[in-house]
Amino acid sequence: MDKKMFCFQCEQTVGCTGCTGNAGVCGKKADTAKLQDELTGALISLANAVDGTETISKRTGQIIIEGLFTTVTNVSFDNAAIENMIQKVRAEKERLVPDCSKCQDPYSSTEEYDLQQLWNANEDIRSLKSLILFGIRGMAAYAYHANVLNYEDAEVNQFFCEALSKIGYEESTESLLSTVLKTGEINLKCMALLDKANTETYGTPEPTDVTLTVEKGPFIVVTGHDLKDLQLLLEQTEGKGINIYTHGEMLPAHAYPFLKKYAHLKGNFGTAWQNQQKEFDHLPAPILYTTNCLMPPKSSYADRVFTTEVVAFPGAVHIDEKKDFTPLIEKALELGGYKEDQTFSGINGGKKVTTGFGHAAILSHAGTVVEAVKAGAIRHFFLVAGCDGAKPGRNYYTEFVKQTPSDSIVLTLACGKFRFNDLDLGEIGGLPRLMDMGQCNDAYGAIQVAVALADAFGCSVNELPLSFVLSWYEQKAVCILLTLLHLGIKNIRLGPSLPAFLSPNILNFLVENYGIAPITTPEEDIKALMNQ
């Protein structure tokens, strides 16, 4: 059977080999997947043009970042929007090197890279290039959010070009492996940049209880990761009798002092992204998608879906760069919300969740933590973090957290936490055993905590009683994994399945050099990790 498309960038790809039919598991159609490939080829061509001019401009950098972010899973399903992005990339390349077609140098040729060359390449080369490509796609999301807050890093921007050029033309396994690890290195800088942007703009996150009750009356649900969009919506809805509720990865917004000052930022609705079609069914309120993860909406709420920034879906109302949320506000007033307060619960029945244990909050108790470890009150730390998803087997993470010993601390971040963030695990020395550090990009904070603990005990991070148990779904998880590899973190447990884009040889390299292993059962993994 002829392949109508090829995509294997997410954890749920068909048969753990790749989506090749009329549509991907994520819902994007074959023609959309082909346009994403075409956009990536155009970005490689633009990157080669930048290589020729040596220094990347802010304008070019932002276009590359926007283009890469557009190709992340569950961001854009709109062919017209992707086609516009392709033309934007091509126009920028033409602006930089209008006479490029006369040059014989393959790094500056106007002929765009055909991604079929990558998908049909030697499996080890394809694997390494895929790690780089999916890594920079994830990193582009973080760079994009930082740029929205007027923070950027020239080294980060320049690396996007370097990495894209390597994807297009490098065939040396050694060079590609070096670039894989460098992707992790630069992503660490990118996450640090976003951490700085968020905290300098909105304040340092502080531990905050968040209700799961939705009050009666008009409301809007905001999902995604973009704090700036939430801020602007809060400003425009203030005093209008409309409450705002976060969803998914927007939950940590409640911990930022600047955003907490808005009294109508009430609580959190729903859980992780993969449950949205059930949770939003007949919802009497509109939903604003600021970033991924968007799923094709059901007819029962399709008229309530609003997108902004790079998120797009055919037929959905798109809020452009002017950020006039009037259509969203009018829809909220029209729908009217619930007639009475509605009390919802987390996956395990909890009525509230707590967030805001960022690296600053945890390290403010560093002395207490160190003494608790020395006294034997804390025997182990687990970072149970990453993406959630729909594939069976992800209840592993719920059971893992439930079964962690009472003398251990569980740190978490990203949307995978919704599997267990409503659990009450008790406290150790006044500190909760379960601490939510924030969004997926707050993996930077987890790294800072690990490094600080290692310094306090005079050892390496790998020598700490600390284990990484990660779940993955899309490309931001890939760049975070590469950052951990860059830092030399070993013995990571990864699931629910291993990436389809890892060839046997590359997977074996990661196993032999970093001890990466697939998850097994909570009981077996806890026992093994506690004894390492």
What is each PLM-predicted segment?
Residues 2-32, 36-37, 41-45, 54-55, ...:
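Anaerobic metallocofactor- and corrinoid-dependent redox/one-carbon enzyme cores
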Residues 43-201:
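Electropositive, gly/pro-rich neighborhoods at or near active sites that engage anionic ligands
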